[in-house]
């Protein structure tokens, strides 16, 4: 019998690799609401958004320090984003329904989730923008994983380094008021379409990490 997690992950198998589950109007409505909230509460400063491609595929790859990161990222980018999130989030029927409506893609971590990678690749090939947090989590070893680089390599989509500043402090218990948040977009890293090789993905991930850490 399949485990609960396997069942939840199987829910992600939509027609055309999940592309039909993406509701752009729903996403944009949520973006306007949460974007206005974040900008008002945290006086969000956006730097370098003009560097982002207006159309076509791109892989957005920020650092990850807080559960607030996805909301801030969505608020700062005018285009619809397909977020990659841990499959555990779909354990809640309500949250899973919301995430599906927003076009998020769940990934079963630690097992090389081929379905999630395929759906992200198809989204890029359809000209969409996807967002992946290479660190994967806001706690633990926080190693920079190769998923974003691998997707960029197999699709030739530009890889965009992004630095989120202040999101960890924004939710800390000892904060005073609402600290100002800043998001900085770096120059997109142009990637030539190539075979998905571990060595190339590792080198590209190292380049991405250096680019993110250089943004201030």
Where are the regions a protein language model picked out?
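A short beta-turn/loop motif at secondary-structure boundaries
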Residues: 50-53, 175-176
């Amino acid at each position: 019998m399949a485990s609960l997690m396997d069942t939840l992950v199987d829910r992600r198998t939509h027609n055309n690799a999940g592309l039909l589950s993406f509701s752009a109007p729903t996403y944009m409505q949520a973006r306007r609401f949460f974007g206005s909230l974040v900008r008002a509460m945290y006086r969000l400063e956006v730097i370098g958004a003009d560097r982002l491609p207006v159309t076509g595929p791109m892989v957005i790859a920020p650092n990850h320090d807080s559960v607030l990161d996805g909301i801030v990222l969505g608020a700062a980018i005018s285009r619809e984003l397909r977020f990659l999130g841990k499959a555990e989030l779909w354990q809640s029927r309500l949250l899973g329904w919301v995430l599906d409506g927003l076009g998020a893609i769940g990934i079963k971590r630690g097992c090389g989730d081929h379905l999630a990678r395929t759906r992200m690749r198809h989204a890029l090939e359809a000209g969409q923008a996807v967002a992946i947090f290479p660190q994967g989590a806001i706690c633990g070893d926080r190693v920079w994983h190769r998923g974003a680089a691998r997707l960029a390599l197999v699709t030739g989509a530009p890889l965009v380094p992004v630095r989120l500043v202040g999101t960890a402090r924004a939710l800390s218990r000892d904060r005073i008021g609402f600290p100002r948040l800043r998001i900085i977009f770096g120059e997109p890293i142009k990637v030539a379409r190539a075979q998905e090789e571990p060595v190339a993905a590792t080198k590209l991930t190292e380049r991405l990490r250096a680019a993110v850490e250089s943004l201030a």
